[in-house]
Amino acid sequence: MWRAANAVISGLIVAACGIIGLVFLGITLILALQSPSAEYTASPGVAKALENIAGSNFLNSGWPSDETRLMLRLLRLMFPYMLMVCLAAVFMGMLNARGHFFVPAMGAAVLNGLLIITVLFFAPRFGQTLDRQILALAIGVLVAGAAQAAYQLPALWREGFRYHWVSPWKNETVRQVVQKMIPGMLGVAAFQLNVLVTQSIAFSVDSQIVASFDYAVRLMELPQGVFGISLATYLLPTLAGLAAEKKYPEFRATLRQALGYLAFANLIASALLMVLAEPIVRLLFERGEFDRFSTERAAFALACLAPGLILFSAVNILARAFYALGDTKTPMIISSVCLGLNIVFAVWLIHAFAQEGKGQGGMGIANTMSAAFNVWLLFYALRRKLSRLDLAGLKHSFFAMLGAAILAGELAWLGSLEWERWMGHARLLPKLGAVLVPMALACLIYWLVLLWLKVPQAQEFWQLLRQRIRKVRR
């Protein structure tokens, strides 16, 4: 096992270093072509050669701008982070395969904690200008990426892992990983690809709606990461083990259970993101040049994107069910089809909503619609692959959770309106209350209604909560 892991890691290092080298070369040439005397003051011959190759008109064209030049320099500095994050992901997969989930999950906390420390403490002391502080943050990204990977090494060491070079060339394990990795990446990156395509289309209409939509995507990624991706990460090795032993009844039961937990968490999260979109955006972003108009635009984008939360998360779960069965091509094909549908939906809806000045809403709905088709096609293909899915018991629970989420969402919306009517939202504490108080009450009502309806997921949550309370009392 460890020899195969070492071969994969060695291949990853070779590939990442090759890509990093090419990017370094490309960025250096771009910067040198625009300012050969500045970049090669010690080599005037190189500057003259570059001028002969590119021509003086290109060198004096004014491209790239100062902002683009800063971006290129930061990219050149930060691009080695790609190697760090790839190693961290490989280490996480190795630990997951050995049944360890907490340590790799905390790796992201290590990364974000170091970035926050860099912004708050290191960057202000690095220089007074914004460029110097941005440079400090770029260095912090590299350090945090290395720490995220190194943080997981002690756990791997205890499992018996020791790295040594194993040539990846003509290695059968590396060949299989590469063969399955490319379609696998396209399969699980459906949400990111759809967002990228939608933003590219929206730029041709109005660049401001792209900024509004980007804020909505960032807010969506929090519950999607907490509930969807974390559950999918845990699920893959479990399903893979059941598939390897050909325990397909247990495979279907585990998948059904995971989808039930996903619906339990994501339906209420979707409802709250929809009805509390404006208070949430106001609390997090409304300050400085981000005014009330900006809040309304971003909130509308979030409200249109929020119904797709459970769909985006379900794509991650279902795609990993295929991967556990050794099939990486089907999710890739379905993702490609839905990417094409997303382009059609985006062109149609962005232009339609842009006539009312709300093109960001069209972006959200387009992504939600393509995700719905993605989930439906994945379910259809998986049912054919497994003969049946045994989801009959989940349907009753799903509609009960959907009804409870709608009820809780309506009450949260009314509660937020009443709170703002009495408390306003000019200061931080009223803004915080307009989000947290309705959210807490809605979650409580949602859970109590599902307990009353005897939904299994709510009952299991109650049992888990009681066990934790008993442990604390002891």
Model-derived regions: residue spans:
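Membrane-embedded alpha-helical bundles of multi-pass transporters/translocases
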Residues: M1-R474
